[in-house]
From Swiss-Prot:
Residues 45-119 are annotated as: Disordered. A motif (Supraphysiological nuclear export signal) lies at residues 41-48. The lineage of its organism: Viruses, Riboviria, Orthornavirae, Kitrinoviricota, Alsuviricetes. Disulfide bonds join C861-C926, C874-C906, C875-C908, C880-C890, C1071-C1083, C1113-C1188, C1118-C1192, C1140-C1182. Changing K51E: Non-cytopathic, incapable of inhibiting host transcription. It comes from Venezuelan equine encephalitis virus (strain Trinidad donkey) (VEEV). This is Structural polyprotein. Residues 723-757, 794-795, 1246-1254 are cytoplasmic.
Length: 1254
């Protein structure tokens, strides 16, 4: 690589110590007799350890050569070169290895890896082959005292004891099982349901487990491996292999495994095949044969081989037959040739190109199709020329071959140019397909120059870069983050997509016709046949020739037509080529360069500058590319927004206590929560109180201030009016009678008239004499009151103590509580039992999964329009055959094709007919790019809980259904059912690109053109395709072979453009949406009932725990509505040291600690959260209670990045200071009113008394 040798630094000189080395320490020598005894004991133990039954050694040379052979080799080392050569010859002519003669045994890997060695060692006594006709058809393994064998594997277990067992069938899991004898249970595998993502081991090496799927590299594992176990690092079975399916570069395995309950679960990927050695049979001339062993092959009988492939084109073993037919027995091929062997069955062709250098032409490089659906900027072209093969059909890399008027020529690929708006970079070619990377443009042109002639072809196609993610970038960035995407694979591995082939039709070749003297001579190419049709002097000639022949009846070249016939090569089923007459033999070959899942580097927009305000967030955005901004509220109504930001902008949003989330470009989501904070001081002066509450409760504050102002105004007005009224009343008598004067004391004494009420006896006597019904009613009122009071006393004195005692007694065994269904919020409580210390219980849900039951309705993707080569009949009529393909259309057109390239095609002008057929099929990339339509039903809930009961902790998974218990340390826990049946998924959902959408898709079989579901299939690989694309055939243009049509655009593509943000960004309650399986996690909605059954052993006697004799609680610091923003200090005196549970029975405060350590005398610090401005709660420490109360201040931070885990219940939202100022205000108004009323009363008494006196 470099022109010069690298220079390495010289080794440093060894360090020399100038001082003499110290003497070696002396140790006493051991007794030789004792050493001999130790060696003998070691030798005996080694014999006992290794003298066990061992399997037959693997094939191949041993790890170490025998000493004898090594010594012979050393002796022969000094011999001459001649003897060495003789020794080699003798070795070649020596007796054959008996193991090498046994062709039935599979050659094992000479150097198996560590995983393979471990599995082979564990499989030796626990896995047994199933033999069928002397071959291993599969395997049976013994797991957990049971024998498991795949039900689809036929044969007999190679063990007499196990073969005699009577098995039971479980068709749902494709397994047969039986209990093994007691003496064999010691050698069985153990199984486990624990399957963390990572790598596991099986017979062929490593198995990757990710997203609930087991995968291996492609080519690892094949038929005959059904029944093999997959093991973890501890040698436990995690799954049993049943089959597999190739998915690009990896193979997905069909397995049977176990869930957390120990219940068997089967996972089968789509289009999976069973891995037993059941032979797939194919057909040839009414004779069946194994598809992998055809009686003929292409190199020996090409025409017959194509006919055989056509007969079995729909056979499940077509791929095996195709591979075996191309690879003749006895011929070895290089591994690189495997990629190109299929397309040796085909040849290039010439086809019509709509835009050549000068108008339309029949081009050797006609472009059939262009696809650019990946996210990597690559383009896949399908052309009439071929790549990777030379003109003879042999392998030749970086070469293009093409058809030039019947002659196949080749050209180096670097002489072929491809460009859009600028030149493209050609990556590779395979068969009819070419992979290139092109810049953006509205058309794509391919051209090459040969013998000073330039051949080109252009087609209109908008080539553009398809970005992945939430930023619309135009070029892949140098730095960023990796994101899942779809890219075109740069290899030609078989991926399940096919391109249809058929025998080529007859093509007129004027070069075959020549004039020799006065007669016409037709010369067919060597090894091919030609059909000759002539009209000479009223004589019609039609015959097939394979060698040169003269036709003396004809004297002009225009009187004869020569058609090239070829039945040993296929061509692409193009609408630009005529169809062969009669029954056309068709086939299919694999499409290379398909879309595959990959990782793409996507850019990251600059982080927004965030400014926090009171319950608000301001984002200042500076995108480099158009970037999506999506927000939602983490409440029951998400109120999501979705906006594409192209220019610098500022966006303001409201944040509530329930949370708010925003996603900027390809950055991860960020969440913020508002705190109950506000300016001002709830415990300060009136203006500070008003400012504080105005920001917290603006409407309530305005309403309260308005009421207070109205009361004050009314009070002042009423007092003023009463004062004026009293003044007028006082002055009026004096104005009328100036000399009248009444003493004030007399007026006061005379104003109070005397009155005497009746006694109780007199009232009852009056009722008895005048109204006896009312008498009895009055008499029964005290009796009824006495009965009510008696019942209340009975309830208070009897029922409540009974319930308390019963609850205490039941707490010894059962305890029921309810916790919020919100991940991360810890729930603390205690169990009080008479005679025992309180038992603390702490529960923290780490994850809550909501998994709906889904049913796949259908799969939809891009469609591809298939067009049969037009069937042409000269001078005659045709009819359409019955249609059976999806959305198939057929029409017959007359008066077409009077001419074709190379001379006239038909002798007639208007009597010619063409049958055009077009239909719809799934695109080649449907396997990678498709959407799945599901119907969702009832959801199950799983909660991952971190539970602490006393001093025992466990992390467990609980099914929240109210039925499934979980046992740990003797504690039995039952959770559920959830308090609400809410789910973020609608009845109809769509899964696409790893995201879920609520979408009301059409039912199966009811798709509309141009809408989602225009093509529908039950699965990606199934053949039950429904299509409705408004396909209409148009009349072909005279003189050109093609099938024009019109069609609605892809509904799948339109849905991808118009779809709203997925549930990942719009789900209520902050749900996190995932796939595989479809589920919602950590939805903060509802509550989970919990029921504990606690054994007596976990309780502690009261005598063994401390008892507080004196306790005092002080709030050192208190910030309300903040995450454990309160600090309480409890000073105490205890009977002894120990550990005590702490708890607040009311919902006023939530404690962070579940228990505290106590000494005989000291203080304990406890952190708590509260939403109360003036918290006052009883704190229970062991069996004692202490009251804590004080004032709390609002938090300083308006916005925080974590939810508040404080208590949501509180008793007072208004501070005592505010109430004091309010009562003072109302109290002052009341004093004014009272003074006015007193004055008015005095005046009224005075006036009335004066009038009476007068």
């Amino acid at each position: 690589m470099f022109p010069f040798q690298p220079m390495y630094p010289m080794q440093p000189m060894p360090y020399r110590n100038p001082f003499a080395a110290p003497r070696r320490p002396w140790f006493p020598r051991t007794d030789p007799f004792l050493a001999m005894q130790v060696q003998e004991l070691t030798r005996s133990m080694a014999n006992l350890t290794f003298k066990q039954r061992r399997d037959a050694p693997p094939e191949g040379p041993s790890a170490k050569k025998p000493k004898k052979e090594a010594s012979q080799k050393q002796k022969g080392g000094g011999q001459g070169k001649k003897k060495k050569n003789q020794g080699k010859k003798k070795a070649k002519t020596g007796p054959p290895n008996p193991k090498a003669q046994n062709g039935n045994k599979k050659k094992t890997n000479k150097k198996p890896g560590k995983r393979q060695r471990m599995v082979m060692k564990l499989e030796s006594d626990k896995t047994f082959p199933i033999m069928l006709e002397g071959k291993i058809n599969g395997y049976a393994c013994v797991v957990g005292g049971k024998l498991f064998r795949p039900m689809h594997v036929e044969g007999k277990i190679d063990n007499d004891v196990l073969a005699a067992l009577k098995t039971k069938k479980a068709s749902k899991y494709d397994l047969e099982y039986a209990d093994v004898p007691q003496n064999m249970r010691a050698d069985t595998f153990k199984y486990t349901h624990e399957k963390p993502q990572g790598y596991y081991s099986w017979h062929h090496g490593a198995v990757q487990y990710e997203n609930g799927r087991f995968t291996v590299p492609k080519g690892v594992g094949a038929k005959g491996d059904s029944g093999r176990p997959i093991l973890d690092n501890q040698g436990r079975v995690v799954a049993i292999v049943l089959g597999g399916v190739n998915e690009g570069s990896r193979t997905a395995l069909s397995v049977v495994m176990w869930n957390e309950k120990g219940v068997t679960v089967k996972y089968t990927p789509e289009n999976c095949e069973q891995w037993s050695l059941v032979t797939t049979m194919c057909l040839l001339a009414n004779v069946t044969f194994p598809c992998a062993q055809p009686p003929i092959c292409y190199d020996r009988k090409p025409a017959e081989t194509l006919a055989m492939l056509s007969v079995n084109v729909d056979n499940p073993g077509y791929d095996e037959l195709l591979e075996a037919a191309v690879k003749c027995p006895g011929r070895k091929r290089r591994s690189t040739e495997e990629l190109f062997k299929e397309y040796k069955l085909t040849r290039p062709y010439m086809a019509r190109c709509i835009r050549c250098a000068v108008g339309s032409c029949h081009s050797p490089i006609a472009i059939e199709a262009v696809k650019s659906d990946g996210h990597d900027g690559y383009v896949r072209l399908q052309t009439s020329s071929q790549y990777g093969l030379d003109s003879s059909g042999n392998l030749k890399g970086r070469t293009m071959r093409y058809d030039m008027h019947g002659t196949i020529k080749e050209i180096p690929l670097h002489q072929v140019s491809l460009h859009t708006s600028r030149p493209c970079h050609i990556v590779d070619g395979h068969g009819y397909f070419l992979l290139a990377r092109c810049p953006a443009g509205d058309s794509i042109t391919m051209e090459f120059k040969k013998d000073s002639v330039t051949h080109s072809c252009s087609v209109p196609y908008e080539v553009k870069f398809n970005p992945v993610g939430r930023e619309l970038y135009t070029h892949p960035p140098e730095h960023g983050v990796e994101q899942a995407c779809q890219v075109y694979a740069h290899d030609a591995q078989n991926r399940g997509a096919y391109v249809e082939m058929h025998l080529p039709g007859s093509e007129v070749d004027s070069s075959l016709v020549s004039l020799s003297g006065s007669s016409v001579t037709v010369t067919p190419p060597v090894g091919t046949s030609a059909l000759v049709e002539c009209e000479c002097g009223g004589t019609k000639i039609s015959e097939t020739i394979n060698k040169t022949k003269q036709f003396s009846q004809c004297t002009k070249k225009e009187q004869c037509r020569a058609y090239r016939l070829q039945n040993d090569k296929w061509v692409y089923n193009s609408d630009k080529l005529p169809k062969a007459a009669g029954a056309t033999l068709k086939g299919k070959l694999h499409v290379p360069f398909l879309l595959a899942d990959g990782k793409c580097t996507v850019p990251l927009a600059p982080e927004p500058m965030i400014t926090f305000g009171f319950r608000s967030v301001s984002l200042k955005l500076h995108p480099k590319n158009p970037t999506y901004l999506t927000t939602r509220q983490l409440a029951d109504e998400p109120h999501y927004t979705h906006e594409l930001i192209s220019e610098p902008a500022v966006r303001n949003f409201t944040v509530t206590e329930k949370g708010w989330e925003f996603v900027w470009g390809n950055h991860p989501p960020k969440r913020f929560w508002a705190q109950e904070t506000a300016p001002g001081n709830p415990h300060g002066l009136p203006h500070e109180v008003i400012t504080h509450y105005y920001h917290r409760y603006p409407m309530s504050t305005i309403l309260g201030l308005s009421i207070c102002a109205a009361i004050a105004t009314v009070s002042v007005a009423a007092s003023t009016w009463l004062f004026c009224r009293s003044r007028v009343a006082c002055l009026t008598p004096y104005r009328l009678t100036p000399n009248a004067r009444i003493p004030f004391c007399l007026a006061v004494l005379c104003c109070a008239r005397t009155a005497r009420a009746e006694t109780t006896w007199e009232s009852l006597d009056h009722l008895w004499n005048n109204n006896q019904q009312m008498f009895w009613i009055q008499l029964l009122i005290p009796l009824a009151a006495l009965i009510v009071v008696t019942r209340l006393l009975r309830c208070v004195c009897c029922v409540v103590p009974f319930l308390v005692m019963a609850g205490a007694a039941a707490g010894a065994y059962e305890h029921a509580t309810t916790m919020p269904s919100q991940a991360g919020i810890s729930y603390n409580t205690i169990v009080n039992r008479a005679g025992y210390a309180p038992l603390p219980i702490s529960i923290t849900p780490t994850k809550i999964k909501l998994i709906p039951t889904v049913n796949l309705e259908y799969v939809t993707c891009h469609y591809k329009t298939g067009m049969d080569s037009p069937a042409i009949k000269c001078c005659g009529s045709q009819e359409c055959t019955p249609t059976y393909r999806p959305d198939e259309q057929c029409k017959v057109f007359t008066g077409v094709y009077p001419f074709m390239w190379g001379g006239a095609y038909c002798f007639c002008d208007t009597e010619n007919t063409q049958v055009s057929k077009a239909y719809v099929m799934k695109s080649d990339d449907c396997l990678a790019d498709h959407a799945e339509a599901y119907k969702a039903h009832t959801a199950s809930v799983q909660a991952f809980l971190n539970i602490t009961v006393g001093e025992h902790s466990i992390v467990t998974t609980v099914y929240v259904n109210g039925e499934t218990p979980v046992n740990f340390n003797g504690v039995k826990l039952t959770a559920g059912p959830l308090s609400t049946a809410w789910t973020p998924f609608d009845r109809k959902i769509v899964q696409y690109a790893g995201e879920i959408y609520n979408y009301d898709f059409p039912e199966y079989g009811a798709g509309q053109p141009g809408a989602f579901g225009d093509i529908q299939s039950r699965t990606v690989s199934s053949s039950d395709l429904y299509a409705n694309t408004n396909l209409v055939l148009q009349r072909p243009k005279a003189g050109a072979i093609h099938v024009p049509y019109t069609q609605a655009p892809s509904g799948f593509e339109q849905w991808k453009k118009d779809k709203a943000p997925s549930l990942k960004f719009t789900a209520p309650f902050g749900c996190e949406i995932y796939t595989n399986p479809i589920r919602a996690e950590n939805c903060a909605v509802g509550s989970i009932p919990l029921a504990f059954d606690i054994p007596d052993a976990l309780f502690t006697r009261v005598s063994e725990t401390p008892t507080l004799s004196a306790a005092e609680c002080t709030l050192n610091e208190c910030v309300y509505s903040s995450d454990f923003g309160g600090i309480a200090t409890v000073k105490y005196s205890a009977s002894k040291s120990g550990k005590c549970a702490v708890h607040v029975p009311s919902g006023t405060a939530t404690l962070k600690e579940a228990a505290v350590e106590l000494t005989e005398q000291g203080s304990a610090t406890i952190h708590f959260s509260t939403a109360n401005i003036h918290p006052e709660f009883r704190l229970q420490i062991c069996t004692s209670y202490v009251t804590c109360k004080g004032d709390c201040h609002p938090p300083k931070d308006h916005i925080v990045t974590h939810p508040q885990y404080h208590a949501q219940t509180f008793t007072a939202a208004v501070s005592k200071t505010a109430w004091t100022w309010l009562t003072s205000l109302l109290g002052g108004s009341a004093v004014i009113i009272i003074i006015g009323l007193v004055l008015a009363t005095i005046v009224a008494m005075y006036v009335l008394t004066n009038q009476k006196h007068n």
